[in-house]
């Protein structure tokens, strides 16, 4: 799996650099459906990731949020699962809470995960049996059990609606983050405790 994690990181970094070239610049925005925008940055990132991963591993399947699904992937033991720009709304708003998200799934079980935030230069990686890393340094999850000491990564939209107001004093801190994938990376830090996905 060393080659897979290396190539996945390379793809995430290259896609992240592409995304940065669009960030706070001019790009096209389309609506895929209910509150689900897509930009030219999403598509450019998707194309680059696919080019790198499929060229390196042509025998693996491909599933991406921005690519038309092919049922052929179901016959593959290993499948790349990609969101080329998770947190598109945040990207559009200029909020640096978005990531490139790449996973490798084997027979339905995730065995590799890579997240890259190109604005903060945070590169998260995890692979089966090897733990998690942030920018090549080992990281571990918090063992905190006291609610008043926990930092909670919660939904930006739920925060705007006031849904977290009753819990403000329950936790040490509430940190609103829009991207679901981006919430999953920082929980690997010892000082961040729990993502909420709503």
Please provide the spans of the model-predicted regions.
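Acidic beta-strand-loop-alpha-helix segment within the catalytic core
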Residues: 103-185
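Short, glycine/acidic-enriched loop or turn micro-motifs at the edges of active sites
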Residues: 68-69, 86-89, 120, 196
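Residue-level signal for inorganic ion chemistry
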Residues: 19, 42, 53, 88, ...
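Single conserved hydrophobic/aromatic residue that forms the stacking wall/gate
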Residues: 191-198
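Glycine-rich active-site/cofactor-binding loop and its immediate structural neighborhood
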Residues: 81-113
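Short, well-ordered alpha-helix to beta-strand connector turns
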Residues: 76, 171-172, 192
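N-terminal subdomain of lithium-sensitive/metallo-dependent phosphomonoesterases centered on the IMPase/IPPase/PAP
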Residues: 1-85, 166
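Short loop/turn motifs at secondary-structure junctions and domain boundaries
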Residues: 71-75, 94-95, 116
């Amino acid at each position: 799996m060393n080659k897979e994690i290396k190539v996945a990181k390379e793809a995430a970094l290259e896609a992240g650099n592409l995304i940065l070239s669009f960030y706070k610049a001019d790009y096209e925005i389309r609506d895929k459906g209910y509150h689900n925008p897509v930009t030219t940055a999403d598509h450019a990132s998707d194309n680059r990731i696919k080019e790198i991963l499929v060229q390196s591993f042509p025998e693996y399947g491909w599933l991406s949020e921005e690519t038309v699904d092919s049922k052929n992937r179901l016959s593959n033991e290993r499948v790349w699962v990609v969101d080329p720009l998770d947190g598109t709304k945040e990207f559009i708003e200029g909020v640096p809470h978005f990531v490139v998200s790449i996973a490798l799934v084997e027979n339905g079980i995730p065995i590799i995960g890579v997240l890259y935030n190109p604005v903060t230069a945070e590169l998260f990686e995890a692979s089966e049996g090897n733990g998690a890393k942030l920018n090549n340094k080992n990281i571990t999850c918090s063992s905190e059990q006291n609610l008043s000491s926990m930092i909670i990564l919660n939904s930006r939209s739920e925060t705007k609606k006031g849904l977290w107001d009753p819990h403000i004093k329950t936790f040490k801190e509430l940190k609103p983050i829009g991207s679901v994938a981006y919430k999953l990376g920082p929980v690997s830090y010892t000082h961040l405790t729990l993502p909420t996905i709503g």
